């Protein structure tokens, strides 16, 4: 399907707007994946707050110019599916990692987070980032454990003091 100039400009404008507000981006090759499976992936992406789009590589290079995702330019070769995480930096990486596990033809090429390229072999770094709620829960449990430990040490010191006296 040939796109005229106005269509191309509209695509670049739409995806650029999403890229400006995105926390991370993941690039994948979806050759050989059935339409049904891709529909499932897109549905899961919408539920996870991930914007997915297949865009021509030349247009994607224009989209990422001047953004933290400019480092991904070299990965725009062949069929490219790009996903932008809008709510949580690891959402798209987690989604693609799980999908690639079930679909051998789906290949994650690379990801970008804060201007740094993350190779496909290291995608776990991004996928295992805790969500905001998980991070708060971990912090609260660490603070709770620290105060409980401090109480135990104080009681032990008091006990030792009384035994020594």
Swiss-Prot record:
SUPFAM superfamilies the UniProt entry points to: Ribosomal protein L10-like (SSF160369)
Highest taxon of source: Bacteria
Gene3D superfamilies: 3.30.70.1730, 6.10.250.2350
GO molecular function: large ribosomal subunit rRNA binding; structural constituent of ribosome
GO BP field: translation
Record keywords, A-Z: Ribonucleoprotein, Ribosomal protein, RNA-binding, rRNA-binding
Ribosomal protein among keywords: yes
GO cellular component terms listed in the entry, alphabetical order: large ribosomal subunit
HAMAP family tied to this protein: Ribosomal_uL10 (MF_00362)
Subunit structure: Part of the ribosomal stalk of the 50S ribosomal subunit. The N-terminus interacts with L11 and the large rRNA to form the base of the stalk. The C-terminus forms an elongated spine to which L12 dimers bind in a sequential fashion forming a multimeric L10(L12)X complex.
PANTHER family reported in the protein's UniProt record: 39S RIBOSOMAL PROTEIN L10, MITOCHONDRIAL (PTHR11560)
Function: Forms part of the ribosomal stalk, playing a central role in the interaction of the ribosome with GTP-bound translation factors.
Protein family membership: Belongs to the universal ribosomal protein uL10 family.
UniProt protein name: Large ribosomal subunit protein uL10
Lineage: Bacteria, Pseudomonadati, Pseudomonadota, Gammaproteobacteria, Enterobacterales
Gene: rplJ
